[in-house]
């Protein structure tokens, strides 16, 4: 029998499921653990990468304890998560500061300085939007987008910005930590 562990990292907790995958897909066990969402008075919304990791570890143990499945029987791991977060990490994938949630709205000034001048479409610079759409099929049109969080850290926490090796989203930071 082969098994997959699936993690779903939501805004306030993780659900971990253990599936058997021989001859179909069947959920064998699941577990849930909450973690914090820290709303700051300046529009910030942060989480704690250590809390994500602790919740992942505890729910993994709990799911396995509900079955006779052994970890070596797991042939795959899947992650899905909230999007548009920002986790600044060092070379070892350690978070340098609390991750900024998709709900964080502190970067209004950085967004406006770059996006709201010249000809605009829905408040966003038309030329920048069209170039971005042509190159990536996406455009950063909200203060909540990770680009503006990155620019906010650059302006307000330059020492952390200088230490950052990579900028990752939620699930990518957890994959990096889990895989080294």
Regions found by a protein language model. Name each.
Residues 1-98, 109:
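N-terminal glycine/serine-rich phosphate-binding loop of ATP-dependent small-molecule kinases
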Residues 61-180:
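Glycine-rich phosphate-binding/catalytic subdomain of phosphoryl-transfer
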């Amino acid at each position: 029998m082969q098994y997959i562990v699936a993690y779903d990292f939501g805004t306030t907790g993780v659900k971990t499921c253990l599936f058997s995958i021989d001859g179909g897909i069947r959920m064998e066990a699941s577990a849930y653990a909450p973690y914090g969402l820290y709303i700051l008075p300046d529009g910030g919304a942060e989480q704690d990468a250590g809390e994500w990791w602790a919740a992942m570890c505890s729910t993994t143990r709990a799911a396995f304890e509900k079955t006779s499945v052994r970890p070596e029987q797991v042939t795959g791991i899947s992650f899905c998560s909230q999007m548009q977060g920002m986790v600044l990490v060092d070379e070892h994938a350690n978070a340098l500061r609390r991750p900024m949630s998709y709900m964080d709205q502190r970067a209004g000034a950085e967004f406006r300085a770059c996006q709201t001048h010249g000809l605009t479409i829905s408040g966003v610079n038309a030329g920048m939007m069209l170039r971005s759409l042509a190159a990536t099929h996406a455009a950063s049109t909200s203060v909540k987008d990770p680009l503006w969080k990155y620019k906010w850290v650059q302006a307000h926490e330059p020492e952390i910005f200088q230490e950052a090796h990579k900028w990752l989203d939620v699930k990518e930071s957890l994959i990096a930590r889990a895989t080294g």
